[in-house]
Amino acid sequence: MADRYWVGGAGTWDATTTTNWSATSGGAGGASAPTSADNVIFNTLSNATAYAVTVGTNANAQDITIAGPAVGNVTITSGATAVINCYGSWTSAATGVVFTTTSGAIINFLATTTGKTITTNNVTLGAMAVILSGVGGEWSLGSAFTITANFTVTSGTFTTTASNYALNALRLLSSSVNVRSISFNASIITVSGPTAVDFTTTTNLTFNAGTSTLIGTNSSSTLAGGAQTFYNVTFAATVSGTTTIIGANTFNVLTQAAISAAGLRFVLLSANQTIATLTLSSGASAVTRTFVVSNTIGT
């Protein structure tokens, strides 16, 4: 294992380019490109002023630490084919770091040991999809985490921790047969995509909702819960549309917000649900109604 420090300002981070890598902080460039065993560090000696790093395909690292230059920001630019493979922990600073991301970019978290953290200090990673897939890996949030792409747990253990950090993503996905565990503690989980949650295949999944609140904001939210137990779930869209719940799930509190203008809101159920408290809101007039329906005619 070695440390690789970014130097020289603007450049490309991929599996082969060596121009901007140094074996020492603020040292000469030309060191070997980081591998899965090497720690990657961006710091105040990476450049004196603002600069941009373009992420290519298979930018590899063990731990990744990103801080800004002495003046201005480092902008991490990830196009649609950009891939970062992180085999350890991720830490990016609250200031001095900006992520510019195109849909299609991916961060793979590939650790196979426990004790890894993901800390972005409330700075959004944008449209960077996140996939946790290291067999035996464990990742804990070290701050609130926001992306506008999918957050996927394929293998390993993910927790928002007892600090109850918020998670914001387009979709929350974990539909596979791999051994995996998800714990939400008392966090607020907000998903904005039409498929809010997809736990369709729950083989080898351990899901602990804790006392969390899951919020779906899309006008056509689908929760494919895989017959799991959730705590508080709110479908927050206030426009016409259909909320779909798939699987025989269990809820502590299930809430459907009222629509705010003329139209209809349908709550479509594919199976029996077990709900301790159900709150169905509708508008103040006959043209703003909420209907609960089955996806099977006659039931």
Which role does the model predict for each range below?
Residues 1-299:
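Extracellular beta-sheet-rich ligand-binding/adhesion modules
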